[in-house]
Design a protein with these regions (language model features):
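Vicinal oxygen chelate
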Residues: 1-37, 47-74, 87-97
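Conserved SAM-binding loop
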Residues: 83-85
Length: 97
C-alpha cells in the first residue's frame, strides 16, 4: 500500500490464474490505467535501480522548470511509470506517510 496524505494506492500482481499478456506498448490514450507517477527523493538512484531491474526509460531524468526532475519509462509489463523528484520546500511536494 502506497500512502501520501489522505490518498492510498494498492498495487496487485496476480500469479494465479496466470494473467493474459496485453500489448506491452499500448498507447497511453487507451482505456485503463496507463500511467503511474511516483514521487521519489533521489531520482538518479531510482533511475539506475529500476533500469537494472528491467525498466526501459524514454530518457534520463530531465529538469522541468527550475527545481523538478522527471523521467518516463515502461516497466517489463509495458506500464508507463513516471519518476518525479520535487524538493520538499516546493508547493508541489507530496509528503508520503
Amino acid at each position: 500500500m502506497l500512502k501520501a496524505g489522505n490518498a492510498c494506492v494498492e498495487l496487485f500482481e496476480y500469479q494465479s490464474p496466470e494473467p493474459k499478456r496485453r500489448e506491452s506498448m499500448r498507447p497511453v490514450c487507451d482505456h485503463g490505467i496507463t500511467h503511474l507517477c511516483l514521487q521519489v527523493t533521489d531520482i538518479g538512484a531510482e533511475y539506475k535501480r529500476l533500469e537494472a531491474a528491467g525498466m526501459t526509460f524514454h530518457c534520463s531524468p530531465k529538469r522541468v522548470g527550475s527545481d523538478i526532475l522527471a523521467t518516463y519509462g515502461r516497466d517489463p509489463d509495458g506500464n508507463v511509470v513516471e519518476l518525479l523528484e520535487v524538493p520538499a520546500e516546493s508547493p508541489l511536494a507530496v509528503v508520503a506517510s
